[in-house]
UniProtKB/Swiss-Prot annotation:
Its EC number is 3.5.1.5. One of its GO terms (molecular function) is nickel cation binding. The active site is at 322 (proton donor). It comes from Rhizobium leguminosarum bv. trifolii (strain WSM2304). NCBIfam families: PRK13206.1, PRK13207.1, urease_alph. PROSITE patterns: UREASE_1, UREASE_2, UREASE_3. This is Urease subunit alpha. Pathway: Nitrogen metabolism; urea degradation; CO(2) and NH(3) from urea (urease route): step 1/1. Keywords: Cytoplasm, Hydrolase, Metal-binding, Nickel. It is an enzyme of class 3 (hydrolase). GO terms for cellular component: cytoplasm. Heterotrimer of UreA (gamma), UreB (beta) and UreC (alpha) subunits. Three heterotrimers associate to form the active enzyme. Carboxylation allows a single lysine to coordinate two nickel ions. Belongs to the metallo-dependent hydrolases superfamily. Urease alpha subunit family. The gene is ureC.
Length: 570
């Protein structure tokens, strides 16, 4: 006779199930479990007196015969594809199955075999997401990588060589020699890394040699001269070698206006950084390119979301990041032309309607590398409070809004940069780069970060204590952050052309080099999941007011945010 159990007792034992709701951190965002792929009465759980024991939930199946390396039990999966409950099976560093784990000799419907060689990660009451991807990195300091990892990022793409002045301002690793040094350095870090070459040139030769040296993308930056000629040349090289182009346009409109940039792009796919403009770009109307079907627009996190402190903070950041002087009037005018409350307010709404597709950091160069997830969810929370539920919601929950916003730092940057065959979602066949969260700390402080199926980072107590929990508890590197486990748990992304040219043998690096693919004509704004809207944008040149399809986009700045001081008092 089946035993009946209350929802509260069930959630306490196995985590929430279909129809249960979970609050994300201290936001006003509530998810509802859409489907539970586990089987009532046959759930697997590890621990004393629990199910994953020999002859019960654990089978006699060997690894060679199909048992997984790791099972993550009873996880609430939050992904662009949905909000659902399942067990997750990992093998050879990849997700091999999502569904029902256990012993097929004893239990029905098992598609994840637990054997004597299987490790268990208990996710009852926890949320599992794909590791985040930050697609706007200035590699100024290697210490950024640990900060990003501990915040739930598992892939970083950008450029730089350290605290050189070119890197402080622009996201470029210029030239084959510097690219080689950065790819070599990548072997030291528990993180999937990808490097962008400099894209500013009017002739293709120097750009081609950077792609052949391993650049996964080319970055056009106004500080190097983003002229129509450089834009056209860079995109032509990218089309030839299947790499992405990122653009930071001409704030001063010296070589042309936004219309000239759109003309130089010629309908080709391009990733537009900080499309609102505070991070740089044609003043005051670069934001209008988010309506172009070939432009993938993104934000950097200092303007996310619009608050009472945003404007004042940006002026100081800008002076430092772009080597400007407060004693030079022209430099002050340059800074003030970029910081506009009207376009920043509109950016909030453009994210909420799915017209802006990606959120990234702009690490140490007008952005905070450890706050990509936090700023994304703060924006989502602000928009729910100010604009209410989205019309696409089905039921009394925020599932669609949550799926829209998580796509902005997982699957969409992966698609934009040709990495979605490897990362970006909780999906069978992809790398097991996964993050576990306590719902109360969702988006703020992860419970555990996995890279390639191995634990790379987690909060950990005093190593001399008798149990793992005594203070001081803080984030520490785990075993996938050391030795050959590090180089076997993460990869370095490069261009296919560089692999064909023998880059791996030439550099002798330990990490696997994986090629990016499908970054050009095969993708566009329409490829951005839940974030593919292309409204017609108008900007008033006098007032800076922004309209989308004729509707004024404006909102009040936030005075209080969730996921903030409450979580960082200690």
């Amino acid at each position: 006779m089946p035993y009946k159990i209350s929802r509260a007792a069930y959630a306490g034992m196995f985590g929430p199930t279909t129809g249960d709701k979970v609050r994300l951190a201290d936001t006003e965002l509530f998810i509802e479990i859409e489907k539970d792929f586990t089987t009532y009465g046959e759930e697997v759980k590890f621990g004393g007196g629990k199910v994953i024991r020999d002859g019960m939930g654990q089978s006699q199946v060997t690894r060679a015969d199909g048992a997984v390396d790791t099972v993550i039990t009873n996880a609430v999966i939050v992904d662009h594809s949905g909000v659902y409950k399942a067990d997750i099976g990992l093998k050879d560093g990849r997700i091999v199955a999502i569904g029902k784990a256990g012993n097929p000799d004893m239990q029905p419907g098992v598609n994840i075999i637990v054997g004597p060689g299987t490790e268990a990660i208990a996710a009852e009451g926890k949320i599992v997401t794909a590791g985040g991807m930050d697609s706007h990195i200035h590699f100024i300091a290697p210490q950024q990588i640990e900060e990003a990892l501990m915040s739930g990022m598992t892939c970083m793409l950008g450029g730089g060589t350290g605290p050189a002045h070119g890197t402080l301002a622009t996201t470029c690793t210029p030239g084959p020699w510097h690219l080689a040094r950065m790819i070599e350095a990548a072997d030291a870090f528990p993180m999937n890394l990808a490097f962008a070459g400099k894209g500013n040139a009017s002739l293709p030769g120097a750009l081609t040699e950077m792609v052949l040296a391993g650049a996964t993308s080319l970055k056009l930056h106004e500080d190097w001269g983003t002229t129509p000629g450089a834009i056209d040349c860079c995109l032509s090289v990218a089309d030839e070698y299947d790499v992405q182009v990122m653009i930071h346009t001409d704030t001063l409109n010296e070589s042309g206006f936004v219309e000239d940039t759109i003309g130089a792009i010629k309908g080709r796919t391009i990733h537009a950084f900080h499309t609102e403009g505070a991070g740089g770009g044609h003043a005051p109307d670069i934001i209008k390119i988010c309506g172009q079907p070939n432009v993938i627009p993104s934000s950097t996190n200092p303007t996310r979301p619009y608050t009472v402190n945003t404007i004042a903070e940006h002026l100081d950041m800008l002076m430092v990041c772009h080597h400007l002087s407060p004693s030079i009037p022209e430099d002050i005018a340059f800074a003030e032309s970029r910081i506009r409350k009207e376009t920043i307010a509109a950016e909030d709404i453009l994210h909420d309607i799915g017209a802006f597709s990606i959120i990234s950091s702009d690490s140490q160069a007008m952005g905070r590398v450890g706050e990509v997830a936090i700023r994304t969810w703060q924006t989502a929370d602000k928009m729910k409070r100010q604009r209410g539920r989205l019309k696409q919601e089905n039921g009394d929950n925020d599932n669609f809004r949550v799926r829209r916003y998580i796509a902005k730092y997982t699957i969409n940057p992966a698609i934009a940069h040709g990495l979605s065959h490897e990362i970006g979602s909780v999906e069978v066949g992809k790398r097991a780069d996964l993050v576990l969260w306590n719902p109360a700390f969702f988006g703020v402080k992860p419970d555990m970060v996995l890279l390639g199926g191995s634990i790379a980072a987690a909060p950990m107590g005093d190593p001399n204590a008798s149990i793992p929990t005594p203070q001081p508890v803080h984030y520490r590197p785990m075993f996938a952050s050391y030795g050959r486990s590090l180089t076997n748990s993460s990869v370095t992304f490069v261009s296919q052309a560089s692999l064909d040219a023998g880059l791996k043998g030439r550099l002798g690096v330990a990490k696997q080099l994986v090629a990016v693919k499908n970054t050009r004509g095969g993708i566009s704004k329409a490829s951005m999941i839940h974030n593919d809207l292309t409204p017609e944008i108008e900007v008033d040149p006098e007032t800076y007011e922004v309209r989308a399809n004729g509707e004024l986009l404006t909102c009040e700045p936030a005075t209080v945010l969730p996921m903030a001081q409450r979580y960082f008092l200690f």
